[in-house]
Amino acid sequence: MLFELKSPFKPMGDQPEAIRQLVEGVNDHLPAQTLLGVTGSGKTFTMANVIAETQRPTLILSHNKTLAAQLYAEMRSFFPDNAVEYYVSYYDYFQPEAYLPSTDTYIEKDLSINMELDQLRLSAVNTLLSGRRDVVVVSSVSCIYGMGNPQDFHDNMISLKVGQMIDKDDLLRRLINAQYTRNDIALQRGNFQAKGETIDVFLVSTDIILRIVLCFDEIESLETLDVTTGHMVAEYDEYTIPPASIFTTTKERADRAVDEIAIDLGEQIRFFESLGDEVKAERIKERVTYDVEMIKEVGYCTGIENYSRYFDGRKPGERPFCLLDCFPDDFLVIVDESHVTVPQIRGMGGNDRTRKTNLVENGFRLPSAFDNRPLSFDEFEALVKQVIFVSATPANYELQRCEGIVAEQLIRPTGLLDPLIEVRPSVTQIDDLLEEIHKCVENDDRAIVTTFTKRLAEELDEYMREHGVRSSYIHSEVDTLDRVRILDELRAGEIDVVIGVNLLREGIDLPEVSLVAILDADKEGFLRNETSLTQTVGRAARNLNGKAIMYADTITKSMQRTMDETERRRAKQMRYNLEHGITPKQIVKGRNTLLDNEQLKETREMFGAVIEPIVDKQKIGTSAKQKSLSIVADGTTIDYQSVPDLQKEIDKTREAMLTAAKALDFLEAAHKRDYMLMLQERLDKLTKK
């Protein structure tokens, strides 16, 4: 099947030229290209057009889960008939195993796995290994971490056909080898049950149950059942059951792995004994022997990932298998916000190695633990044959890789220009800033202020409040959900200014912000380099009156480069608007009000994996409460419904909410949630009478 891009929009501005240049580069097999796109220029739409025109299976890399979820939702809207997958870390919480020699403290691994995200990861692997080429996988850097051997995953797929002869016991053994667990009492995801000649398999990668009906070792029928009702959804002539985990192996390899672990254990014991360290020798013997017995008895043990090299059939030091191994050879990689994502990929391995060195040297793990690791940056580069870096501020690495040839996308569909930049003396920066914020508030606009330290952010917030400004601060010690709430309050006009340090750059979409103020802009360093300054200034690029003020006593090289580049972009944007008769238009976007913390907690429990994307997406679209009110106005008059009718409506709305959440349709999910809460409130009032 081919990629088919569906959108009411057509490429405009300098999008057509950027698309042409990038497509031409991909078809000419250029190893690296860069798309320099300003905030609001439609970079995601350009990515989608490149994918559609090149027809390449594509991996899109993002530097965090929330932005990855936004990209995933957008790509699904562009390619509704193609396979768009989401692959991020499936941990809600993860505390790695560690040993601190200085205090002789051993820390057990502790984790919480999000089953919804695990399902999405498995779906991505299954789709890629199915042979489809119309596949887009949106991923975090989780894609460079180890997974099972893709060949083993493929070999453990179970292909079934109506009329096929198969021994029932053999089929059950194959299901167990594919990591499914027998459960004849309560069928759950990843389980199967066998009753008579009927075998039901609750697939992990989809929300369906596959029913296999046998008749004298012949497959009589293959049906999929609705998980909730148990009713038949569809009949199939053939069906392939994917493994229940991306960490799977064959029985032969598992048997061989146990033998290899025993050999390496003997060598490590002799090594410690040669050093005269009987404590470590006994520790490693005890721990690994127990692990091996667990593997023999139940097929796994705590920390089994530290033995992954044996199960994968890899040699010592050989790189791990990862998601990239599941793609065909001609796949395309798009690195979004590359100035952040590339350094993140580069830095993944260092801390991992240091932590495991302590475990290995002190007899807690075999040296094979070193081979359970993310890809090194060199290994990542070797696997990626063609890459497009996407950023408003590409770093030197990206520019060097593409030899300075950059596709520019500086024109916004709205005609908005990059913000004006002013430099003002820092000696009077606080008083001047206060005056500017008051002007901003008078125009019903908002402001963002970036400081150099967390302490200064808090002190400035207190100062603003004392002078009648509704403000709040954001920095790394502020909880994630609180950050989202604060930004939503800024958009809603409940506060006028947000003061931050380094959390107001990539991915923050705030059309109401007309003023960005950068305090101590002349303090060179990570927070005030060209990339950081340009990204921060860009937060005012979605407002018609956008302006940035840099408070500084001297103009640094980074400041000058930022101003020169911004002026170059403004000149090109103004020239384009003049030539095409375009009048810049203010972006008008609706807002949703976040729930209070207790409601957020309840909603997280209902939505599971996707609460953070839902919360983040609430910054876009019409207010969910307004939508809920409009539903009531359109005919569902809840004030006059009976208790049974209200309960039915609540159940129906909850089901629709969960369906939307699973589909990552965040706005619809939020809409249904608020409507359900309104119904529940009315029901509570009726039942108390």
Residue ranges and their predicted role:
Residues M1-L36:
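Conserved pre-motif I regulatory segment
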Residues D28-T34, R56-P57, R133-V135, D445-R446:
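Pre-Walker A (Motif I) flank of P-loop NTPase domains
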Residues D28-V50:
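Walker A/P-loop
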Residues P57-A69, Y86, K280, C440-E462:
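Conserved strand-helix element at the start of the C-terminal RecA-like helicase core
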Residues A69-S77, E97-Y99, E459-Y463:
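Short amphipathic alpha-helical segment within the helicase RecA-like ATPase core
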Residues P80-S89, G303, R446-I448, L460-D482:
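Conserved RecA-like helicase motor-core motifs
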Residues Y87-D432, E436-E442, D461, R465, ...:
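N-terminal cationic and glycine-rich segments that engage phosphates or anionic surfaces
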Residues V478-G500:
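Conserved helicase ATPase core of P-loop NTP-dependent helicases/translocases
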